[in-house]
A protein has these predicted regions:
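Binuclear metal-ion centers of metallo-dependent hydrolases, dominated by the metallo-beta-lactamase
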Residues: 41-53, 58-119
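Core dinuclear metal-dependent hydrolase active-site scaffold
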Residues: 1-46, 113-119
Length: 119
């Protein structure tokens, strides 16, 4: 996939894997959006280096075939080192929002319907 410019922001597609299926994530300027996946190759991971905001899939705490669990998502957060991370695509198996949110590292939070992310 080719990168494009939209409203003065570089839009860069990122190939990630949903189990064996290739799916797209996006980097739009200082924001990376990576959802519905469980694997990313090092060369694709390098494309999100320096993002300020990361939006990333974290389905639940237990391992899953085609999605990141919480530990896997947090490992990627440590590698990418954004200023702010929003976890998305959570299931009911993640736990109660306030309880899980209280356990997350600084700069990482559970998202919610209606959240507006400023970049």
């Amino acid at each position: 996939p080719k990168q494009k410019t939209y409203r003065a922001s570089l839009v860069q597609p990122l190939i990630v894997k949903h189990h064996r299926l290739k799916v797209l994530g996006l980097r739009v300027g200082p924001l990376a959006y990576l959802t519905d996946f469980n694997a990313i190759d090092p060369e694709e991971l390098a494309k999100v280096e320096g993002v300020k905001v990361l939006v990333i899939d974290a389905l639940r705490t237990a391992k899953h075939l085609s999605h990141n669990n919480l530990a896997e998502a947090l490992t990627l957060v440590e590698a990418i080192r954004p200023e702010t991370t929003w976890l998305i695509h959570m299931s009911h198996e993640m736990g109660l929002h306030a309880q899980v949110d209280a356990t997350l590292p600084a700069g990482v939070g559970l998202s919610w319907d209606g959240l507006v992310v400023e970049v």
